[in-house]
Design a protein with these regions (language model features):
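Membrane-proximal helix-turn-helix segments that form the acceptor-binding/catalytic region
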Residues: 20-21, 70-88
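Short His-centered aromatic/hydrophobic patch
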Residues: 33-38, 56
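Donor nucleotide-sugar binding/catalytic pocket of nucleotide-sugar-dependent glycosyltransferases
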Residues: 79-118
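Conserved acidic donor-binding segment of nucleotide-sugar-dependent glycosyltransferases
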Residues: 241-242, 246-253, 262-267
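A conserved mid-protein helix/loop that constitutes part of the nucleotide-sugar donor-binding site
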Residues: 127-150, 167-173, 254, 353, ...
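Single conserved hydrophobic/aromatic residue that forms the stacking wall/gate
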Residues: 2-5, 9, 13, 181
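Short hydrophobic beta-strand element within catalytic cores of glycosyltransferases
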Residues: 217, 226-229, 239
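Aromatic "clamp/platform" in nucleotide-sugar-dependent glycosyltransferases that forms part
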Residues: 190, 209
Length: 385
């Protein structure tokens, strides 16, 4: 057994050497991995030339508290190797708290953005609920059947569409039949046209036992659907209870049913929550996420951007020219000779004043007056003269 263990350890070491050699040969600046691969990257990190970032795509409980899933019973390995990464990204402040509390690991929060923008929105008059999910234990489909059975006893109009597939498909379909609600549940299966179902529904349901940062909620908000979800994980960071949906107590199917009935029987409430959901969707615009990730990359690489070096002056300038300098953080600066600075900025309709106002303001500073300043503006033809 000792020989076998020694041989296995030797094989692992050889594989690690192979990966280190390959990754270093690629001359990457930053390597990003997700889920369990983050632990493996942490093992390689000290030998890599690139900066390293691990990225969690589920909540702390979903990774560490579920038997035989991802980091189950691997706390010691996480404590040993995740700190070797340059950054470890989590989805919410709750995850940040739990990693620090239980493992003493520092993390950084980056939320997932919405994946699309839709001009078309749902019809609040529709009497259809929607679920978009995988048929697995974590998604709480058994809890959904229990809640919807009780709902159907008090309502004879609404239907439930469920799109998705998975290992528990047959079990959940059988459960619906056993409860006598099979004529009220439309099991769609996998579809290439989820938009059709979002637009034909007016309320989205998410009875999950655990979630990280569910993309389906942002999809629902983008189409104007309020969301009912059990109060678990980061749900209250996404759903404003009573405004963009409801957060019944975790796994209380009766309270989940009550929330469904409340929305189903009040069209004006659905309209109000639909408007709120659309507004809330703007919080998850991809442009905001890109900005946050760009800042992270600059910090990890030790790049001090134009904005970082001149933040004090820029903030002062914003007070003086509030409409002219809001895009200053997008300016890139290159010192190409001792007394020459090249700036790269973007224009866009009406935005030529942004870098120009900032430029004039910086010239008031003594340390900039001996330099030649060259500005390169993208989309110049789209600007005002």
């Amino acid at each position: 057994s000792t020989l076998l263990a020694s041989s296995a350890a030797s094989d692992v070491y050889k594989r690690q050497e192979k990966w280190v050699k390959y990754l270093n040969e690629q001359n990457y600046d930053i390597i990003i991995t997700t889920a369990s691969l983050s632990l493996r990257l942490g093992m390689l990190a000290p030998e890599l030339n690139a900066k390293t970032i691990g990225w969690q795509h589920n909540c702390y409980a979903g990774y560490l508290d579920v038997p035989n899933v991802v980091f189950w019973k691997q706390e010691c390995l996480l404590q040993e190797y995740l700190p070797k990464l340059d950054r470890y990204i989590v989805l919410s402040d709750y995850d940040k708290r739990d990693y620090k509390k239980f493992l003493d690991i520092d993390t950084e929060v980056k939320i997932n953005p919405r994946s699309f923008v839709s001009e078309r929105k749902c019809d609040p008059k529709s009497k259809r609920f929607l679920m978009a999910t995988r048929f697995v234990y974590a998604k709480g489909l058994d809890l959904m059947m229990e809640s919807f059975e009780e709902f159907c006893k008090q309502d004879d109009e609404w239907q439930l569409d469920i799109i998705g597939a998975g290992d528990l498909w047959n079990q959940i379909v059988a459960d619906a039949k056993r409860r006598g609600i099979e004529d009220r549940v439309n099991f769609v299966g996998y579809t290439n046209e989820p938009e059709k179902y979002y637009l034909n529904s007016s309320v989205f349901l998410l009875p999950s036992r655990w979630e990280g940062w569910p993309m389906v909620i942002m999809e629902a908000f983008e189409f104007g659907l309020p969301v009912i979800a059990f109060h678990t994980g980061a749900m209250d960071l996404i759903i404003d209870d009573g405004k963009t949906g409801y957060l019944p107590e975790a796994f209380d199917t009766k309270k989940f049913t009550d929330a469904m009935l409340k929305l189903a029987h009040d069209e004006e409430l659905r309209r109000e929550m639909s408007r709120n959901a659309i507004w809330k969707s703007e919080d998850f615009a991809i442009e905001k996420a890109v900005k946050e990730w760009n800042r992270l990359f600059n910090r990890v690489m030790g790049i001090k951007t134009f904005y970082m070096k001149n933040e004090e002056q820029i903030l002062e300038c914003r007070e003086k020219y509030p409409l002219r300098t809001s895009y200053a953080e997008f300016v890139k600066e290159y010192q190409i000779r001792d007394n020459t600075i090249l700036y790269e900025a973007f224009g866009g309709r009406g935005m030529i004043c942004n870098p120009y106002a900032l430029f004039l303001y910086l010239l008031e500073k003594e340390e900039y007056q001996d330099y030649t300043h060259i500005w390169v503006l993208e989309d110049f033809e789209d600007n005002r003269k």
